[in-house]
Design a protein with these regions (language model features):
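Phosphate/diphosphate ligand-binding glycine-rich loop within oxidoreductases
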Residues: 36, 40-146
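Positively charged, low-complexity intrinsically disordered leader regions
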Residues: 1-60, 64
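An alpha-beta-alpha
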Residues: 153-157
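Phosphate/diphosphate-binding glycine-rich loops and adjacent basic-rich segments that engage nucleotide
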Residues: 147-152
């Protein structure tokens, strides 16, 4: 995994230029996948997915992306992980960080994701909190860019 990886908690954490580069990468990966040539950029990497509430689309999206890019996703079900109850968020972040390359968290409270960030030694991705859902925002903006009229800019949408 690259040392350039960082937490993805809010789209505001990235500059406009960085977000546009992310959109371009998504476009290139989508094109490669259409012809069966998806690069194995995450070969051997593991994603720990912490879910405090069930989700179909978020879970499937992350699992499929990891698989197509050569990695593996580990789904920690709501009944299996009790953040801040059976063990502290700090302990959870520290232990899971030793076993995976990235943590994705879908939590009931935004503070939980921030606590994971404060204690994890690997990048943390916000998969939904009561504050925002940045991975969905990126997907929605990409879809708008992909389907916009040729004479319109993204700000016109």
């Amino acid at each position: 995994m690259s040392a350039a990886l960082r937490h993805f908690i809010d789209t505001q954490d990235f500059s406009r230029e960085e977000l546009l580069r992310i959109m371009e990468l998504i476009r290139l990966l989508k094109e490669a996948d259409k012809v069966g040539a998806c690069p194995r950029l995450l070969q051997g990497a593991s994603l720990g997915m912490i879910f405090e509430e069930p989700s179909t689309r978020t879970r499937v999206s992350f699992e499929v992306a990891m698989t197509k890019l050569g990695g593996h996703a580990l789904y920690l079900r709501p009944g299996e992980i009790h953040l801040g109850k059976r063990e502290s968020i700090r302990d959870t972040a520290e232990v899971i960080s030793r076993m995976v390359d990235v943590i994705e968290a879908r939590t009931l409270k935004h503070k939980t994701v921030l606590d994971l960030v404060a204690n994890a030694t690997v990048p943390v991705m916000n998969g939904l909190t009561d504050y925002n859902h940045p991975t969905q925002v990126v997907c929605d903006v990409f879809t708008m860019m992909e389907h916009k009229l040729p004479d319109k800019s993204l700000t016109d949408l």
